[in-house]
């Protein structure tokens, strides 16, 4: 055990109506913040965290361990407001490749040269299929043409790495679901699919990710179901395993989707349960399954997304809380325990992606491109003829290739295709 979307709700695959909501306003100018103070503050936080690496929400023996202090930031000098403190520049990112997919396709890029595809049906008489897109060649291949559980089940979600292909099938009539995985080699399935988890209407369909030879997922009770008081689990299955094993337990639901970036898993279990509702955004090295960093959110503040990139968390809050200080505000934050934090005051819609000091943050119809080292930001606009909600990130966390997708109109003004774009970072 670790030391501490159809259904893509937490993926923020929102429709056009949901994305017409107004952006949050900026916050006041933050005095006293310079690049040097930000770097020095981050270094101090790194040293403090290194001393406390044994702090986590789960233990090897499952026992409760002491967590870090909730981060109630009231000193605004510890916050760098992107739109006020950084310089606005023209975006220099260039499209390295672009492909048009059939209308309704949704790509998911976990890592490497492959993106899993939820493919739209070819006609009203056929069902969705699952496929894969080579980001090196643009070749699209159908891998699974019908649900393994029979005609009453439909494809619900899909992910892949270079070595494993995983998907959820669900019966919308009963709420039953299964999580399956199958080895993948050079974009082709190997062997037979293996059912690695399942649930009924009391359990939310697995939130999952793929990395290397592993599938990692969260099994949680529905917040309003009869099992809502049950413990949630984060599990791992590797190609060749007979059974999955539990990595972490949470007394209550995890707050965020499991995200994997450069071999580091980020999850947000409940912590400090005797003191109230607290979420600990926690990063684990998957090679050792040891905690490398943790940030405890203010009481009752639930993170919307979180991923560990470099030596900082990139996380977001989707509502304005009446308490909690700065971290109780709606927006996206980059930082770690003790601060300082880079803050973008915009409604969060998806997981952050990027490389090094460059972060791409989805905001309404475009992406903010934030460079914390250069102290600049720019706007990556959606492709021509994109629908009003613009493009969404298919990638997550640290990546050499940022992948986005958008529904674009044809010459007649109607939605015609899904345009996938890749940007070298």
Stretches found by the model and what they are:
Residues 1-33, 45-53:
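N-terminal secretory signal peptides
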Residues 101-110, 150-159, 200-209, 251-261, ...:
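Repeated scaffold domains used in trafficking and secretory/extracellular systems
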Residues 70-101, 125-145, 178-196, 226-249, ...:
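Surface-exposed loop/turn elements that mediate protein-protein interactions on large endomembrane-trafficking
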Residues 202-261:
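Extracytoplasmic/periplasmic C-terminal soluble domains
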Residues 32-40, 47-66:
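N-terminal twin-arginine translocation
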Residues 107-162, 166-172:
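Post-signal peptide N-terminal segment of secreted/secretory-pathway proteins
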Residues 111-120, 163-170, 213-222, 263-274, ...:
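Short beta-strand elements that form the blades of beta-propeller/WD-repeat-like
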Residues 153-226:
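A generic tandem-repeat structural signature
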